């Protein structure tokens, strides 16, 4: 109904105070007899009286609404709550008041609506080989050229008045989602033609999508919520975000929001979940249907005048779908809200609630008008609606040539193509009436007219006083931040485990590092260790926030959705998120820094300590903002993570420790000016050394014969020392070694603060401007080379197909034609007294209770029941897929017990379509056929059978298409067909299980799947299928029914009968009501047994079944089937291989699985190019950062740290491998292990082997990119061993890469999540870093940690790599590295140093110097002597290489063992 004013609103129906009953003291209109009353007095008294009566009336409304009694129909907690009555009362309370603002209503008129995008209906799959070929195309498209226009909507027109509901119908790909997004103003990624006309009640599309965003909303079918928030908090947040400035009844905002939350939860039947987590696919929470209702409730709480709902009933049963539509109807009738709803498989009761319907056919409008007139319109065109088909299904069938039925005599008159349907619509009188109505609407509500002013005033009245006039948000920016802070606190409170785990983990990391540098001495021997420790502390503080990239991407979809709802600015959420992270950052900084600072004996003075804490904290905040800005700047997590490794490497290399400033190459030295870490490191180094003098720990010369030398004849053996002094100035040391000066200390702090502010501003701006990547839509992707074939097929239109009248609808075909060559089944699967018990919280619960039944070849059996009845559980038990609990009873095949080959001889079509995204349809089928078909078939026969399956499932047109992911690859129907095809390709000898094959599909796709199942049964397949509340026509497709009640008890097992008469007769005979004419037997059946929402029964139907003659007949038949054990059977064979667990031998499994994994890597260029960037890119960066390094003391130290930084690549490789393995494992454990496709050993070994192969290639490239630019080959020229030592370096790098691969698999093999394995890798990486001998050699380690040095694989990696690349070569000192002192009188420097150099080595710059000349002494003259400082021996290089291979082997076998120990089921409990 159209509601344009408040005059036709209903009242609450409650009694209001009588105007005659006025409280004492009130003025009256009548006067005393002797009182003289003027006209002005009467006017004044009348005005006061009206005001007070109105106030009493409002108070009455408010008290009735917000203070309703316990059993009031307005109390959402009451069992008698009436949603429609509450809505009327709420309307009166909110809008019918003197100080209230008028309600906002929005209709929408659209004409010449053309929407298009740029792309292609087909694309080719990128691989490592062809990805580079796309670069020119991508560049050309980015510059605006080479784009192919794809039209999505063509000349759509319509009018939806305020308070009306529009039903949008069409199969997937018809443009329904695009239409709803366009109407809601969410056109990101879409292009609306400039000539398109849209009028929102006088408001233009630009105004609606900017100043009034949130007044027209689009709700997608995807559920995006914070999983750890409770349902109550999620909806309370939504209610608060849109709560008006003036609250009726004098309530606080919090009370108002809680009341609305309780009401909306009561409306959608989720009141019981108020304290339950929302959850998601990985976090346990409410059920899928309840989560969908949370999504609906969240959007509804905004009370937007125009609401667009895209398949929001997906996952809901028909009763809840109808209830959803009824709630929208109430909103429309009471508040004048306009709703546009795209709905799949709409029940008739839901369809009847709509005012108008729009039907789209491949983007063409073929009808718009009254919902009750739509069927008649298409019947006039010559189409016939079957008697039991719903109107919505009939309208959708117009878009399918195989489904629509043409009346006799209309064969050559009925339209066939989308264009013909659209043309007939344009010529219809209904369209002319529509155009006239649009013209009238546009005249009454002109753009930028008075309606816009009234709408803006109403919206302004709701917004905060501090909010801008043209802002779409209700709350002020401060209010948004406060609200988001509250939510962040709730998230933290609900799940503090991650935060606490990080705190504890970081604290233990600090303890470990502090123990390595425990109680450093206060002399010069601690110089290197102080620098190394401060470097580690700076990195720990700076990179503590690196995982915030992942955190931001986890919630990005949610933030963008709620920003579109106009709940808050994305920047407000970003600011609140940062503020809420500060306590953790401060606590973490305090724990880590206090532990490291004082345990290691850094400068124990108040001023330096607090300055260090100040620098560490500010640097941590700067880097946190950097990572947050980088995450908000990118569109996908791959874009964020891929370059992050290079960025982190640059930040580490150009800190000033690994490469001192004077050694930085000019082409890259600018990096340090942009690096907050370098400013922080300089500041803390100056803070540690400034103003201090350190006693010298060793002198040159010293030892026997030098005990009595004067102070001028010796010098401290460290950089910055001067002869004649026993102490070294800290300022001189940091200036000589690093080029740092004290005047930079506070300057650096200011720079860090400025960087933090600048990065924060950048982050907040990008959150507002940069949106995440959206799906390209359902685009078929082919292998390069076959894409042109697909494009040609795309050109074929409906006119090339036979006419609709010549194609009998598969839907109504009584006997589909059998497909020649498809495997038929002859064995009967039967079960008796099956029970299933599981332990939940130490209590045994029975899930299945004495279930009987059988499946015979050529029959289609439906398994139905209420949610929680155990339908899927029964399938799992019958298919031997349960891994916990106790199963009792018997499951037999032809009277024989099942053997170990049973699982591979049955097909199980899961509800989730799980496939490897990179394979083609044909490859997926061939993989199943080659590994699961019995060995008696040759490879050629198996592949030939695959082609027959392709034809059977009508997949020939897309047999070479890539599976992809939903949205970019196969659509929902094609994915479901592939799921069924994978099971058929295995030639199941026994039967086929299907779990909810039509769940979430539109009616057309559901019919297509049912046609397929019926075709399979006609080809001799035995099928058991779970299905949830099917339509009447779909239900009639089944032959038999197994109906379960709560607790897994059987209610009925037997024939359904023609028109479900057999089934209905059974219930009527046993006390159930008859099925009304035109009712759906499936829904009626559930109502009879009390399984439908709101239904109730006093009859114990499971007990009725046990006492029925039908049950006795079932028992007799089961007894007969047991006798089949003495007869020949297809499951009995003399071939031992037919009883084996797997059809293919282990070498064949390993070969096929390895080939597929290798193929997956090749077809995932993002992974391999990321690996290349990580390894080769990092190696080039390191190589040229240390380009042709010289063999000075500092130069050698730089090269040692070059190897140390190279270990960073190893750790990053481990992080990269882990999630890829999890993807493979999910598919294997969810489907392929259950169906016995191949063994777990083949799975683990093939994944490790393929990683070995790709990492070998990476090792070759990495070696070339690192070894030669650094110039390490020059060290081997002195011993004429360039080839042998270069080969050894390559072999060590190769072994290192294989170690990274095997270690990653060791970590993830037995662990459930990639996050946990990555956390373990992080801890292990820090341990291996710390104890490899570079930061502190074994002589400097506490005795407790020596074992860690010995068992650390990085120890032998570093030792082997440094000895092979640096060892046994001459070295020299730089000018600032020589130690200068005076020789004794009458002696040359050579004579004076002869004895010392014989023991300590080194060389003199001028051994003949004497007298006033100073001796210039270099402590080392050979690299092997230098390496001994790190306990590295050149002679052990081959031993170190061999030990690396030992680690690789141990890791590999450890991964296999851990997978078996933690992931492989060891057997089931069975009685």
Swiss-Prot record:
ATP binds at residues 865-872. Glycans are attached at residues 4, 71, 311, 519, 842, 1386, 1422, 1429. Residues 1-19 have a biased composition (Polar residues). GO terms for molecular function: ABC-type transporter activity; ATP binding; ATP hydrolysis activity. The efflux inhibitor FK506 impairs the transport activity. Keywords: ATP-binding, Cell membrane, Glycoprotein, Membrane, Nucleotide-binding, Repeat, Transmembrane, Transmembrane helix, Transport. It is a multi-pass membrane protein. Residues 25-40 have a biased composition (Basic and acidic residues). It is found in: Cell membrane. One of its GO terms (cellular component) is plasma membrane. PROSITE patterns: ABC_TRANSPORTER_1, ABC_TRANSPORTER_2. Pleiotropic ABC efflux transporter that shows a strong substrate specificity for the azole class of drugs such as lotrimazole (CLT), fluconazole (FLC), itraconazole (ITC), ketoconazole (KTC), posaconazole (POS), econazole (ECON), metconazole (MET), miconazole (MCZ), prochloraz (PCLZ), and tebuconazole (TEBZ). This is ABC multidrug transporter F. The gene is abcF.
């Amino acid at each position: 109904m159209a509601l344009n004013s408040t005059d036709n609103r209903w009242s609450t129906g409650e009694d209001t105070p009588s105007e005659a009953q006025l409280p004492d003291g009130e003025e009256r209109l009548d006067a005393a007899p002797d009182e003289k009353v003027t006209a002005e007095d009467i006017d004044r008294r009348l005005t006061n009286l009206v005001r007070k009566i109105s106030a009493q009336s409002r108070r009455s409304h408010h008290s009735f609404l917000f203070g309703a009694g316990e059993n009031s129909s307005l109390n959402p907690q009451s069992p008698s709550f009436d949603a429609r009555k509450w809505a009327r009362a709420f309307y009166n309370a909110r809008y019918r008041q003197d100080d209230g603002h008028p309600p906002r209503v929005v209709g929408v008129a659209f004409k010449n609506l053309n929407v298009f995008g740029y792309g292609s209906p087909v694309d080719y799959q990128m691989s490592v080989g062809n990805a580079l070929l796309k670069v020119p195309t991508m560049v050309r498209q980015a510059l605006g050229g080479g784009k192919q226009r794809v039209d999505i909507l063509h000349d759509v027109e319509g009018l939806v008045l305020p308070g009306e509901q529009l039903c949008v119908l069409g199969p997937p790909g018809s443009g329904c989602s695009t239409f709803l997004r366009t109407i809601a103003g969410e056109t990101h990624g879409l292009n609306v033609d400039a000539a398109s006309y849209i009028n929102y009640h006088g408001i233009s599309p630009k105004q609606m999508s900017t100043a009034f965003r949130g007044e027209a909303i689009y709700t997608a079918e995807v559920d995006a919520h914070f999983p750890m928030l409770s349902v109550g908090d999620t909806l309370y947040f939504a209610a608060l975000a849109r709560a008006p400035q003036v609250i009726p009844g004098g309530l606080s905002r919090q009370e108002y929001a809680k009341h609305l939350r309780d009401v909306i939860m009561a409306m959608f039947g989720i009141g019981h979940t108020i304290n339950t987590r929302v959850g998601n696919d990985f976090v346990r929470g409410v059920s899928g249907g309840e989560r969908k209702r949370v999504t609906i409730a969240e959007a509804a709480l905004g009370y937007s005048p125009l609401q667009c709902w895209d398949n929001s009933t997906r996952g809901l049963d028909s009763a809840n779908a109808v209830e959803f539509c009824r709630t929208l109807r109430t909103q429309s009738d009471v508040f004048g809200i306009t709703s546009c709803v795209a709905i799949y498989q709409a029940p008739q009761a839901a369809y009847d609630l709509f005012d108008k319907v729009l039907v789209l056919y491949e983007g063409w409008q073929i009808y718009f008008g009254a919902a009750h007139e739509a069927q008649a319109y298409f019947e006039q065109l010559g189409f016939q609606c079957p008697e039991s088909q719903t109107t919505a299904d009939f309208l959708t069938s117009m878009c399918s040539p195989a489904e629509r039925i043409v009346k006799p005599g209309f064969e050559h008159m009925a339209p066939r193509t989308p264009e013909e349907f659209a043309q007939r619509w344009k010529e219809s009188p209904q369209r002319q009436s529509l155009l006239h109505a649009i013209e009238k609407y546009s005249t009454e509500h002109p753009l930028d007219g008075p309606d816009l002013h009234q709408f803006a005033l109403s919206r302004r009245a709701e917004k905060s006083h501090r909010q801008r006039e043209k802002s779409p948000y209700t709350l002020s920016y401060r209010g948004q931040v406060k609200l988001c802070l509250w939510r962040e606190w709730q998230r933290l409170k609900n799940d503090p485990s991650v935060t606490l785990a990080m705190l504890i983990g970081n604290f233990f990391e600090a303890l470990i590092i502090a123990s390595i540098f425990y109680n450093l001495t206060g002399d010069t021997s601690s110089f290197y260790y102080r620098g190394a420790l401060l470097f580690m502390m700076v990195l720990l503080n700076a990179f503590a926030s690196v995982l915030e990239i992942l955190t931001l991407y986890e919630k990005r979809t949610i933030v963008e959705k709620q920003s579109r709802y106009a709940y808050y600015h994305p920047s407000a959420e970003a600011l609140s998120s940062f503020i809420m992270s500060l306590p953790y950052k401060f606590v973490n900084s305090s724990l880590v820094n206090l532990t490291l600072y004082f345990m290691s004996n850094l400068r124990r003075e108040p001023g330096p300590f607090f300055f260090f804490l100040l620098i560490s904290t500010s640097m941590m905040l700067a880097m946190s903002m950097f990572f947050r800005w980088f995450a908000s700047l990118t569109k996908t997590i791959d874009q964020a993570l891929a370059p992050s490794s290079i960025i982190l490497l640059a930040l580490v290399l150009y800190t000033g420790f690994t490469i001192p400033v004077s050694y930085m190459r000019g082409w890259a030295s600018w990096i340090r000016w942009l690096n907050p870490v370098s400013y922080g490191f300089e500041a803390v180094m100056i803070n540690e050394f400034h103003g201090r003098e350190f006693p010298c720990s060793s002198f040159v010369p010293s030892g026997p014969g030098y005990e009595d030398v004067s102070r001028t004849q010796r010098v401290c053996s460290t950089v910055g020392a001067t002869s004649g002094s026993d102490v070294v100035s800290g300022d001189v040391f940091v200036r000589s070694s690093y080029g740092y000066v004290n005047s930079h200390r506070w300057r650096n702090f200011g720079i860090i603060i400025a960087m933090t502010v600048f990065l924060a501003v950048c982050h907040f701006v990008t959150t507002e401007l940069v949106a995440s990547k959206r799906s390209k839509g359902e685009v078929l992707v082919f292998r390069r080379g076959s894409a042109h074939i697909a494009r040609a097929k795309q050109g074929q239109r409906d006119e090339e197909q036979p006419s609709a009248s010549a194609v009998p609808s598969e839907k109504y075909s009584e006997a589909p034609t059998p497909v020649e060559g498809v495997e038929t089944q002859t064995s009967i699967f039967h079960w008796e007294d099956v029970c299933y018990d599981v332990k939940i919280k130490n209590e045994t619960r029975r899930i299945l209770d004495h279930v009987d039944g059988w499946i015979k070849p050529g029959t289609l059996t439906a398994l139905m029941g209420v949610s929680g009845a155990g339908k899927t559980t029964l399938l799992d038990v019958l298919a031997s897929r349960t891994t916990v609990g106790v199963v009792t009873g018997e499951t037999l095949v032809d009277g024989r017990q099942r053997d170990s080959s049973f699982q591979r001889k049955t097909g199980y079509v899961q509800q989730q379509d799980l496939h490897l995204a990179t394979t083609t349809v044909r490859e997926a089928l061939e993989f199943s056929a080659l590994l699961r078909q019995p060995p008696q078939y040759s490879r050629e026969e198996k592949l030939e059978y695959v082609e027959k399956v392709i034809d059977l499932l009508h997949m020939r047109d897309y047999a070479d298409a890539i599976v992809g992911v939903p949205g970019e690859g196969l659509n929902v129907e094609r994915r479901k067909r592939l799921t069924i095809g994978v099971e058929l390709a295995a030639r199941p000898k026994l039967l086929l299980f299907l779990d909810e094959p039509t769940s979430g599909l539109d009616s057309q796709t559901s019919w297509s799947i049912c046609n397929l199942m019926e075709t399979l049964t006609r080809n001799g397949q035995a099928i058991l299928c779970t299905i949830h509340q099917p339509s009447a026509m779909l239900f009639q497709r089944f032959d038999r029914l197994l109906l379960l009640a709560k607790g897994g008890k059987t209610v009925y097992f037997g024939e359904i009968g023609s028109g479900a008469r057999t089934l209905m007769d059974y219930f009527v005979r046993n006390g159930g009501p008859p099925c009304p004419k035109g009712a759906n037997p499936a829904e009626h059946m559930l109502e009879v047994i009390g399984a439908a929402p709101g239904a109730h029964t006093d009859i114990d139907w499971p007990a009725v079944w046990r006492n029925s003659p039908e049950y006795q007949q079932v028992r007799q038949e089961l007894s007969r089937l047991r006798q089949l054990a003495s007869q020949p059977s297809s499951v009995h064979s003399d071939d031992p291989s037919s009883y084996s667990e797997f059809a293919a031998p282990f070498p064949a499994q390993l070969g096929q699985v390895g080939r597929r994994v290798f193929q997956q890597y090749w077809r995932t260029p993002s992974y391999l190019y990321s690996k290349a960037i990580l390894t080769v890119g990092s190696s080039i960066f390191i190589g040229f950062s240390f380009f042709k390094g010289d063999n000075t003391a500092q130069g050698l130290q730089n090269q040692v740290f070059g190897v140390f930084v190279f270990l960073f690549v190893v750790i990053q490789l481990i992080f990269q491998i882990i999630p890829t393995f999890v993807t493979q494992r999910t598919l294997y454990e969810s489907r392929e292990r259950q169906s016995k496709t191949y063994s777990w050993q083949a799975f683990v070994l093939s994944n490790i082997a393929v990683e070995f192969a790709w990492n070998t290639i990476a090792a070759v490239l990495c070696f070339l990119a690192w070894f030669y630019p650094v110039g390490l080959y020059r060290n081997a020229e002195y011993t004429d061993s360039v080839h042998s030592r270069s080969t050894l370096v390559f072999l060590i790098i190769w072994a290192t890469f294989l170690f990274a691969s095997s270690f990653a698999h060791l970590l993830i093999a037995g662990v459930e999540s990639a996050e946990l394995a990555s956390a373990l890798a992080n801890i292990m990486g820090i341990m291996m870093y710390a104890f490899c001998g570079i930061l502190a050699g074994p002589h400097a380690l506490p005795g407790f940690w020596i074992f860690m040095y010995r068992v650390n694989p990085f120890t032998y990696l570093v030792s082997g790599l440094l000895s092979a690349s640096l060892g046994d070569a001459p070295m020299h000192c730089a000018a600032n590295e020589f130690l200068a002192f005076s020789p004794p009188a009458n002696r040359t420097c050579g004579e004076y140093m002869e004895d010392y150099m014989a023991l300590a080595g080194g060389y003199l710059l001028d051994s003949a110097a004497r007298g006033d000349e100073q001796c210039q002494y270099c402590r080392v003259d050979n690299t092997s002597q230098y390496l001994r400082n790190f306990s590295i021996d050149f002679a052990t290089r081959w031993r170190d290489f061999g030990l690396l291979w030992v680690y690789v082997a141990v890791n590999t076998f450890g991964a296999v063992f851990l997978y078996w120990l933690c992931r492989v089921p060891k057997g089931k409990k069975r009685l």
